[in-house]
A protein has these predicted regions:
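Acidic/His-rich segments in extracytoplasmic proteins that coordinate ligands and/or metal ions
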Residues: 34-37, 45, 51-112, 116, ...
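Short, solvent-exposed amphipathic alpha-helices that sit
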Residues: 98-102, 137-191, 210, 214, ...
């Protein structure tokens, strides 16, 4: 019987000097593009690439990495793509775990600094959110993670609505809701003032320039109502930070632990989450190499290879077999 395996890496959020999580200063994998590696080039993380003809390609090893194949509307995993053949694997980070860490990072910062970040003293902590790609499962998870942690999420068919709110100056939007947070005897309202997908005129998503333009528009509309800036990744986050948030001392939170974002924490960037791209790269190549060599997929991962290479399960990575693979 066939089993399609899932390798998900554990995310580790390290405390920075500003009491928020940040990652290492090494390169990052942002989850901004769909990727796969195989002996045949594959361009999209969807079942549309699946060779259902039973031809020669259907027997070749296939390793999805960085972005799990998923439904572009709901973020639901594409089990057809994940079960392409017995040598199909996914290597990447747990999108939901990372999203939860980012949301908790923002919440912890607000709790620790509510009195100082409420810039106009109105008792409303207003945040704006840069969404990378409304059809990308990582982007969906990160949007849900922030809204879940802050209490601004609204249930939509059993999951938190990840739709952009547009603008929400008065808290009347239906895709989000106002939340309340009691801190040191004072009750604050948490409100998502605005959010949008950062797509440029050419159709490119996760676009930093679009985010930089958006923060200009939002700051003109909301002014001192903006207390926190949140982004699905550091590329967009740093664009908004450099364009406006840095000069106005508004904490900005991203994702990926890009080197410039980590360095910017010393200048007021709120925090970021590391995906440990070095481990992801090793696992992607290792799983593919093992499949091509016809050796046990765990070689050099959970069990040492001939050179002694081995990772520690539960620390460096986590392994989980797909429940539908039996």
């Amino acid at each position: 019987m066939k089993r399609s395996k899932l390798l998900s890496l554990l995310l580790v959020g390290a405390l920075s000097a500003s009491l928020v999580a940040c990652g290492s200063a090494s390169g990052s994998t942002s989850g901004d593009t769909a990727n796969s590696a195989s002996t045949e080039t594959t361009d999209s993380a969807s079942s549309e690439t699946t060779d259902s003809t039973g031809g020669e390609n259907s027997k070749k090893p296939l390793v999805w990495f960085n972005r799990q194949p998923s439904n572009s509307s709901t973020g639901e995993l594409d089990m057809t793509a994940l079960n392409f053949n017995e040598n199909t694997y996914y290597v990447g980070f747990d999108a939901n775990q990372g999203a939860e860490l980012q949301g908790q990072m923002v919440l912890d910062y607000i709790k620790a600094n509510a009195a100082t970040i409420d810039r106009n003293g109105d008792g409303v902590i207003g945040y704006i959110l840069a969404i990378g790609d409304i059809g990308h499962n990582d982007s969906i998870a990160r949007t849900r993670g922030v809204r879940s942690a802050l209490g601004t999420g609204v249930d939509a068919s059993g999951v938190i609505d990840a739709s952009p709110v547009g603008t929400n100056a008065d808290g009347s939007a239906t895709v989000v809701q106002d939340a309340t947070l009691d801190i040191d005897g004072k009750t604050y309202t948490i409100r998502e003032l605005a959010s949008q997908e950062m797509k440029n005129s050419a159709g490119a998503t996760w676009d930093a320039a679009t985010a930089g333009n958006a923060i200009g528009t939002w700051s003109a509309s909301f002014g001192d109502d903006i207390d926190v800036v949140v982004s699905n990744n550091d590329g967009m986050g740093m664009s908004m930070f450099n364009a406006w948030a840095k000069d106005n001392k508004v904490p900005t939170f991203g994702y990926d632990a890009n080197s410039d974002a980590v360095a910017a924490i010393a200048e007021g960037y709120g925090g970021t989450i590391s995906q440990h791209a070095d481990v992801q790269a090793y696992l992607t190549l290792r799983v593919l190499r093992n499949a091509l060599d016809g050796v046990d997929v765990n070689t050099g991962i959970g069990t040492a290879d001939a050179a002694g290479n081995v990772l520690e399960e539960g620390v460096d990575y986590r392994y989980s077999a797909e429940e539908r693979s039996y």
